[in-house]
Amino acid sequence: MQRAMLLGLLGAAALAAVISAPVDNRDHNEEMVTRCIIEVLSNALSKSSAPTITPECRQVLRKSGKEVKGEEKGENENSKFEVRLLRDPSDASVGRWASSREETGAPVEDSPGQAKVDNEEWTGGGGHSREAVDDQESLHPSNQQVSKEAKIRHSEERGGKEEEEEEGKIYPKGEHRGDAGEEKKHTEESGEKHNAFSNKRSEASAKKKEESVARAEAHFVELEKTHSREQSSQESGEETRRQEKPQELPDQDQSEEESEEGEEGEEGATSEVTKRRPRHHHWRSQSNKPSYEGRRPLSEERKHAAGESKDANVATANLGEKRGHHLAHYRASEEEPDYGEELRSYPGFQAPQGLQYQGRGSEEVRAPSPRSEESQEKEYKRNHPDSELESTANRHSEETEEERSYEGAKGRQHRGRGREPGAYPALDSRQEKRLLDEGHDPVHESPVDTAKRYPQSKWQEQEKNYLNYDEEGDQGRWWQQEEQLEPEESREEVSFPDRQYAPYPTTEKRKRLGALFNPYFDPLQWKNSDFEKKGNPDDSFLDDDGEDGNGVTMTEKNFFPEYNYDWWEKRPFSEDVNWGYEKRSFARAPHLDLKRQYDDGVAELDQLLHYRKKAAEFPDFYDSEEQMGPHQEAEDEKDRADQRVLTEEEKKELENLAAMDLELQKIAEKFSQRG
């Protein structure tokens, strides 16, 4: 019975171990468990005196049971880490990695991938996440180590208790004492090995954490060094500026310097307080600093970081801080009232020299300077080194666009309320050149300052274009306009006659335009007339505007020549004969009469010949026996009744006229062939 109970217990334990084996374990663990179960069953059935379970199989089964309990423990730890996630989100990645490592139960190896992850956590990544991890892990490194070591010890103690309970269940009191002693020895040895392995693992993890904490502390120390260097350089520059200020200033400037020193002392105290504060208060202290301290230019940071061994880390950290503090600075600048601008709006206030050159769009640029040009030149001779000037100018010039627009709007309001003529400071030429090179916008100046700044030659050139609005300026401007207008008029006088008396157009234009619109167009007839001087007809036809240079429209012009009315009086019947012929066909107009106006008889013969040709071409149109209406026929009969019959003499005359007509026609054809 006892043997059967033992076999049943072993089978149940083996089945439970097989069923509860995690899915993530490989085939090797499953094979070991099945082999152990088969060996136990075969030994129990074959040999009664032999030990039922070998120590190797006992270790395998114990490991499988521990894995089941490890899963439950991992779930509990996951729930704990989820609660911790809500409180401390920076430990999420570390907690999840530890829980997954404990669930699998795999040994921790110092792989290069884990080292890369640690390096990326501490050196890579964005500004916010890296700073948060640095802050929170530098705050709580000891707590994490203590909690993890306590968990490891607690799990070891629980494992030892569970082993004892299993042994008590499997072997009742008073039975198999020898086997139990041997098993206890084996378990103690395995427990020692397990403890040694767990101790090694905990030591390796502790070493890694210590290395990462040391790395973070070194990085933090470097950042603090750079911040302290920058602040000390700023304070030293301000002190040297204060010491080098001339003591020739009035009492009002001295009182303003004292107030400024008090403010700078307060700023130095706040900077010392921020140095003493721990790392996790660094973000708040940064937001309380003035805007020009929070926003240093990238060029200055690169100069500081070039001498460091880890310049890339410092630059990325500064960029991340800038991104993080950008919104906080903007809100702080909006919420806090600008007392300096309110003071500057009063007439008795005069800005100190330290605030004279600020960023673009600020009111300090427009504040009146109490000193004269001689004092400025003296001060410039004793001026501090160029590096300090460039650093201060760069620091003040790198303001954000939001603050620029905000202060610019305020500045426009102050300037709109009241503006005095001497409100703009007179800048030294060297200082303004330096400011322009550094990227500042030019300050609005009076004409006197611009005259001093530019050499005489440049001012004479500018005087032609930009004159003052006084009497001399008006006279000079009118003289200048007259000088500018005179060469244009002379140019027009030179070019207009060329355009007026241009050479006569080509034969193609004359054929296309002159002969097309006027059959009596002859260039030789009026070559010396006034018509040629007024402009060519074909040029005016080609103009799209319909106007020439004098503003005369096409309709007002006379495009046709002055006709010789004496010559037309000698042709009494030409209009009656040829009254509609030129209107009907311009392209086929005869050129004989155009060329032979000197010969009256030939012109008359030519008209008669054309009349006869058209009569032959259109007999119905010229025939008297055409079809007529009844009324016209009655009138025609009356005319015939009135007409008398021709005599023989009249018939002979008509025949002679016809013969003469034929001869004249031949003569006219000969002339036309010659021409």
Curated annotation (Swiss-Prot):
GO cellular component: extracellular space; secretory granule
Top-rank lineage group of the source organism: Eukaryota
Residues annotated with Phosphoserine modification: 93, 99-100, 129, 147, 190, 255, 259, 291, 309, 333, 362, 372, 375, 397, 490, 529, 540, 624
Signal peptide: 1-20
Keywords: Amidation, Cleavage on pair of basic residues, Disulfide bond, Glycoprotein, Phosphoprotein, Proteoglycan, Secreted, Signal, Sulfation
Recorded coiled-coil stretches: none
Entry keyword annotation includes Signal: yes
One Pfam family hit: Granin
Primary residence: secreted
Glycosylation site residues: S93, S236
Chain positions found as Sulfotyrosine: Y339, Y469, Y563, Y622
Location in or out of the cell: Secreted
Annotated stretches, region: Disordered: 64-507, 528-555, 620-646
InterPro entries, sorted: Chromogranin_AB, Chromogranin_CS, Granin
PTMs per UniProt: Extensively processed in glucagonoma tissue by limited proteolysis at conserved basic residues. Alternative processing are seen in different tissues. The proglucagon-converting enzymes present in transformed alpha-cells are likely candidates to be involved in tissue-specific processing.
Disulfide bonding pattern of the chain: C36-C57
Extent of Acidic residues compositional bias: 250-269
Regions of compositional bias (Basic and acidic residues) in chain numbering: 64-90, 148-161, 168-248, 292-311, 361-410, 429-452, 637-646
Tissue: Expressed in the brain, adrenal medulla and anterior pituitary. In the brain, localized to the hippocampal formation, the endocrine hypothalamus, the olfactory system, and in anatomically distinct structures in the pons-medulla.
Residues with the Arginine amide modification: R674
Subunit architecture: Interacts with ITPR1 in the secretory granules.
Function noted in UniProt: Secretogranin-1 is a neuroendocrine secretory granule protein, which may be the precursor for other biologically active peptides.
Family stated for the protein in its record: Belongs to the chromogranin/secretogranin protein family.
Protein name, UniProt field: Secretogranin-1
